[in-house]
From Swiss-Prot:
Domain Exonuclease: 7-170
Keyword Zinc (UniProt): no
Name of the protein described by the UniProt record: Oligoribonuclease
Primary location class: cytoplasm
Organism: Ruthia magnifica subsp. Calyptogena magnifica
Compartment(s) where it occurs, according to its Swiss-Prot or TrEMBL record: Cytoplasm
Length: 180
């Protein structure tokens, strides 16, 4: 295991897309090596939010987080955002040096915006760079629109399954598009 080169994959579920008004309701992480083999799966943590905050979610988030069961789990959780941040950092420090890993995932800049607002210590744990799988997807759509290179996934909109999908998606693009 190389704590200098391992990659941290992260996904957040939020009440919406605007970090100034919406909040994190779930966080999960997975650590892989550079060949994208999973080394360790971090805790998948559901963060308590009060009913006032949850009632301000838009229709899309309300429907998806209700159908996945996440909204019920948020109400039942007693975990604070700070506690989730501390538990996530405790896990990550076992596998990756501070500042070594880019933030990996899909549309990861959005997650980083929320981490900056709500989990700043965790946000600073990452390198400033990203490995954003959605960039490759957008390039394939634009450069090879008729090819069967686009990775199809059936997301549950739960943080841990979304990370696993992102890792599989990057493996797919590495094999069929990048040819490394």
């Amino acid at each position: 295991m190389n704590k200098k080169t391992n990659l941290i994959w992260i996904d957040l579920e939020m009440t919406g897309l605007i970090p100034e008004k919406d909040v994190i309701i779930e966080i999960a992480t997975i650590v892989t090596n550079v060949q994208l083999h999973i080394i360790a799966q971090g805790p998948s943590l559901v963060i308590h939010q009060n009913d006032e905050i949850l009632s301000n979610m838009d229709q899309w988030n309300t429907e998806h987080h209700t159908s996945s069961g996440l909204l019920r789990r948020v109400r039942e959780s007693s975990l604070s955002c700070k506690q989730a941040e501390a538990q996530t950092l405790e896990f990550l420090k076992k596998y990756v040096h501070t500042g070594a890993s880019p933030m990996c995932g899909n549309t990861i800049c959005q997650d980083r915006r929320f981490l900056y607002n709500y989990m700043p210590t965790l946000e600073r744990f990452f390198h400033y760079r990203h490995i954003d799988v959605s960039t490759l997807k957008e390039l394939v759509i634009r450069w090879k629109p008729n090819a069967k290179m686009i990775f199809e996934k059936d997301s549950a909109h739960l943080a841990l399954s979304d990370i696993q999908d992102s890792i599989d998606e990057l493996k797919h693009y590495r094999n069929v598009f990048i040819n490394v």
